């Protein structure tokens, strides 16, 4: 029976290998649905499980390289849809599925509906940034549309109490899951707009499956969000969850807690910022006052140097010096005359001529008179010169010039304006009058 020369003899390994090749070629890619059972995850990171329906089951494996990119983690009893190829585990001869992608059953239909609605609303412009309303600068009252007993409202209130306990919160309770949940959400958005009692709305809930979050993908809700006069922050699910509400809302927050942080100022940060600004303003004021005080002292010093009183004081000092010198010269002259007289007296006494004595006495009296006249003349000339200099100084005094109706015009850099060429349109001018200053601007 086994001696026919054309009969091929297989080994078990060869048979399993060729069956494997046939299976992988014939069923290279297929999509099927079933229930997960016997799900295990060994240390290797691969997933091993069975996929079954009410009449049959098949073993399946999903390698770590594929399952680590999955956002969905299956559990026993879950209905799933998988994309896989058929293969054979050669050592045992078991045929199995090699799964490349997995999602909850029905999620594929949800995704198709989601993508179709997203494209249509985007084409209408509902997601455009042109229509996004900015959050108010000063928020005093916040409205929250969510379940009154869910985790989302607890997270929001916790964050607001920590960051800005002074803010008021108004809760608009609504279902956030189920067939008619979107209708309640729409009703509360419209109610908040009618009451107009809050500055901003937070629309959200905690995480969940795609089916749990589906009410936030409803077209009617998207249009209600778009038509809202109040700015809306969408905070649905976790950071990896994205809904139509997120796209159409004015602002999207990754989580309800993140939404609370977006709409609430950090009181301590604001206090620190105000303190810094006040300190900077005070320092700038002190610095400016110090500079102005130094400038005023410099101007006062310059005015003192130019004041006519100082000029008069200098001339008076010079007059005193001349008077002292003249008196000294007079004393010296008298001293010399006395010496001469003293020298002549013995000679006269020796000659004893009365006539010469009388003449000498007369000459002496004349000389004394002339000397006194010369002294008075010198003093009168000095006084006249001093008066003349004082009059000249007084006539050219800046204060007297200003008193006659004249003025001095300077730029804001204290440069005296002598010609129209010294200024240009827009310059600030300072005009000094006898009783104050005027500030003006060059117009033409």
UniProtKB/Swiss-Prot annotation:
It is an enzyme of class 3 (hydrolase). Its EC number is 3.1.11.6. InterPro entries: Exonuc_VII_L, Exonuc_VII_lsu_C, OB-fold_nuc-bd_dom. The keyword Nuclease applies. It holds the Pfam family tRNA_anti_2. It catalyses: Exonucleolytic cleavage in either 5'- to 3'- or 3'- to 5'-direction to yield nucleoside 5'-phosphates. CDD domains: ExoVII_LU_OBF. Keywords: Cytoplasm, Exonuclease, Hydrolase, Nuclease. Bidirectionally degrades single-stranded DNA into large acid-insoluble oligonucleotides, which are then degraded further into small acid-soluble oligonucleotides. Belongs to the XseA family. Heterooligomer composed of large and small subunits. This is Exodeoxyribonuclease 7 large subunit. It comes from Pseudoalteromonas translucida (strain TAC 125). The lineage of its organism: Bacteria, Pseudomonadati, Pseudomonadota, Gammaproteobacteria, Alteromonadales.
């Amino acid at each position: 029976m086994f001696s026919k020369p054309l009969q091929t003899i297989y080994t078990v390994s060869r048979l399993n290998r060729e069956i494997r090749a046939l299976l992988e070629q014939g069923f290279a890619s297929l999509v099927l649905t079933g229930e997960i059972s016997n799900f295990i995850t060994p240390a290797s990171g691969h997933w091993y499980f069975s996929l079954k329906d009410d009449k049959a089951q098949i073993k399946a494996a999903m390698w770590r390289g594929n399952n680590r990119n999955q956002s969905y983690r299956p559990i026993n009893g879950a209905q799933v849809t998988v994309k896989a190829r058929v293969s054979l585990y050669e050592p045992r001869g078991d045929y199995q599925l090699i799964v490349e992608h997995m999602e909850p059953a029905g999620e594929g239909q949800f995704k198709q509906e989601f993508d179709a609605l997203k494209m249509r609303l985007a084409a209408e412009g509902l997601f455009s940034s042109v229509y996004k309303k900015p959050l108010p600068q000063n928020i005093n009252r916040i409205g929250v549309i969510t379940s009154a007993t869910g985790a989302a409202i607890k997270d929001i209130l916790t964050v607001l109490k920590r960051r800005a306990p002074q803010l008021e919160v108004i809760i608009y309770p609504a279902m956030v899951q189920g067939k008619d949940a979107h209708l309640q959400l729409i009703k509360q958005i419209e109610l908040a707009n009618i009451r107009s009692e809050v500055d901003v709305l937070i629309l959200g809930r905690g995480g969940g499956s795609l089916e749990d979050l589906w009410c936030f993908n409803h077209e009617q809700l998207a249009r209600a969000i778009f038509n809202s006069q109040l700015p809306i922050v969408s905070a649905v699910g976790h950071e990896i969850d994205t809904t139509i509400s997120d796209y159409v809302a004015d602002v999207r927050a990754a989580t309800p807690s993140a939404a609370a942080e977006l709409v609430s100022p950090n009181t301590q940060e604001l206090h620190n910022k105000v303190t810094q600004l006040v300190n900077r303003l005070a320092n700038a004021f002190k610095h400016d006052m110090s500079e102005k005080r130094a400038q005023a002292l410099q101007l006062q010093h310059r005015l003192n140097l130019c004041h006519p009183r100082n000029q008069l004081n200098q001339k008076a000092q010079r007059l005193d010096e001349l008077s002292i010198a003249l008196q000294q010269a007079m004393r010296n002259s008298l001293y010399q005359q006395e010496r001469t007289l003293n020298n002549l007296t013995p000679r006269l006494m020796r000659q004893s001529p009365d006539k010469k004595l009388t003449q000498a006495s007369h000459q002496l009296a004349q000389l004394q008179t002339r000397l006194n006249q010369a002294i008075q003349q010198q003093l009168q000339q000095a006084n006249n010169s001093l008066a003349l200099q004082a009059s000249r100084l007084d006539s050219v005094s800046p204060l007297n010039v200003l008193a006659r109706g004249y003025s001095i015009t300077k730029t804001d850099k204290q440069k005296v304006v002598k010609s129209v060429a010294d200024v240009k349109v827009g310059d600030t001018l300072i005009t000094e009058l006898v009783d104050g200053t005027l500030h003006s601007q060059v117009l033409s």
